[in-house]
């Protein structure tokens, strides 16, 4: 019998995110699902829903709120305006500011529709339980993320490139890591690419577009997973008038155990 994690741990983590200094959430509340977030005016919501449906690997939708709501069934007592450690405010596709509290920005558009997107942090606990080190957690930093040259399928007014996260994995355990992550397709699932970063248009693994660089040791292979920062690449390319997102690596922690998504 598998013991479920204590929901109080998820609530405590969100409280820490709300009240504390912003920090990446990798390794926080292990055993609970973490999410990417994007909030758009209602006029853009259908375009994004279609964009996510056409690009399920980087944009797996776990919940969609009603217009104007800051609540989610994934954590009914949470507040999506305050319970992420760091938010990004976008205006005309340009990052205007980062803030630990999005309440004021949220009030600018009373019809915001929020999408919660699966995050690969969710399968990091099973990787660790299998004895596979997650390097950015071990180093106490953010996961490295890269903008690739792979186009997502466009939808309505939205288009953009796919973003990937990278984790160094010992060569002999790459297949195991792919199998473990592949059990959770709702949170990006198996890798989209293994080795050869240049095949994704990535020139330098020491210079991620988002997050922090991590050490790659001899005998390790860079493994790339589709990433929920992909919607932010679409914002930069498509330039909707307004959006709120999480800052890359600063996720929304839900009350849902990560085992819920395993198949």
Swiss-Prot record:
UniProt keywords, alphabetically: Lyase
Family annotation (SUPFAM superfamilies): PSTPO5379-like (SSF160920)
GO molecular function, one term: lyase activity
Positions of disulphide bridges: none
InterPro entries in UniProt: D-Glu_cyclase (IPR009906), Putative_hydro-lyase (IPR038021), UPF0317 (IPR016938)
UniProt keyword Iron, yes or no: no
Broad enzyme group: lyase
Similarity annotation: Belongs to the D-glutamate cyclase family.
Record-given protein name: Putative hydro-lyase Pden_0321
Organism per entry: Paracoccus denitrificans (strain Pd 1222)
Lineage start: Bacteria, Pseudomonadati, Pseudomonadota, Alphaproteobacteria, Rhodobacterales
